[in-house]
UniProtKB/Swiss-Prot annotation:
Protein name from the UniProt record: 5-oxoprolinase subunit A
Gene of this entry: pxpA
Annotated organism of origin: Methylococcus capsulatus (strain ATCC 33009 / NCIMB 11132 / Bath)
Pfam families on file: LamB_YcsF (PF03746)
EC number: 3.5.2.9
Function: Catalyzes the cleavage of 5-oxoproline to form L-glutamate coupled to the hydrolysis of ATP to ADP and inorganic phosphate.
Length: 260
């Protein structure tokens, strides 16, 4: 049987009446939702509504904690102590878990956002602080991070189940990190190329870096960015291609076992 893959999207990133992304449409296409917890985007009303919609569609709930940086959308690196990282992650997980419980759902995973995700990929102390926060809240939660990263290693060391994430529409560097968003070639804008990259990670566990190097990239979940105008169309196309290859799509909590 073909291996199973999860499809996730970063959602709940609106503020008040200002709308961002295509959350309602994407919730019909993805299996897991990473929901902003107020530190880079979202607010209590948006969090509550996004959780409600996800629960009503059977989409797995995930907390998407960030560094405290609304102006920079959580994408600016910060130098914080490990205890500060642990506390801000724990705070945000707890906030989203409250909305999940109120809506009759439960948290399944935690995926850091933006600079928190990027820094923790290579910073062992930051990664360990994030893993400690997740374990302290609920040792049954799945920690999502890039394959081969310090974040994944920290999750395994903490005894957590981990999910290795790949990005369909982002280019990679030869060391396996994402090409910085500031570079003009950071995003893959041609849908066919993005689909091919996603299939390469799922079927062969590899990706071609920006310089042409083929590097290992085994994945359990693929991130589909929801803020582009063609996000929903791309998600439909990818699901169709996966189905054509007999690759099941399902939320992490339904099939991913503990990896530690």
């Amino acid at each position: 049987m073909a291996r199973t893959i999860d499809l996730n999207a970063d959602l709940g990133e609106s503020f008040g009446p200002w709308r961002m992304g295509q959350d309602e449409t994407l919730l019909e296409l993805v299996t897991s939702a990473n929901i902003a917890c107020g530190f880079h985007a979202g607010d209590p009303d948006v969090m509550a509504e996004t959780v409600r919609l996800a629960v009503s569609r059977g989409v797995a709930l995930g907390a998407h904690p960030s560094l405290p940086d609304r102006q920079g959308f959580g994408r600016r690196p910060m130098a914080l102590r490990p205890d500060e990282i642990r506390n801000l992650v724990l705070y945000q997980i707890g906030a989203l878990a409250g909305f999940a419980r109120a809506a009759g759902g439960r948290l399944v995973h935690v995926k850091p956002h933006g600079a928190l995700y990027g820094q923790a990929a290579s910073d062992a102390a930051m990664a360990e602080a994030i893993a400690a926060a997740v374990r302290a809240f609920d040792a049954n939660l799945i920690l999502v991070g890039p394959a081969g990263s310090q974040l994944v290693r920290a999750g395994q060391a903490a005894g957590l189940a981990i999910a290795r994430e790949g990005f369909a529409d982002r280019r990679y560097e030869p060391d396996g990190t994402l090409t910085p968003r500031g570079r003009p070639e950071a995003l893959i804008e041609e849908p066919a190329e993005a689909v091919a990259q996603a299939l390469g990670m799922v079927e062969r566990g590899e990706v071609t870096a920006r310089d042409g190097t083929v590097i290992p990239m085994p994945v359990d979940t693929l991130c589909l960015h929801g803020d582009g105008p063609d996000a929903a169309a791309f998600a439909r196309r990818l699901r169709m291609e996966l189905a054509a290859r007999g690759i099941p799509v399902a939320a992490l909590g339904g099939w991913l076992s503990g990896a530690a």
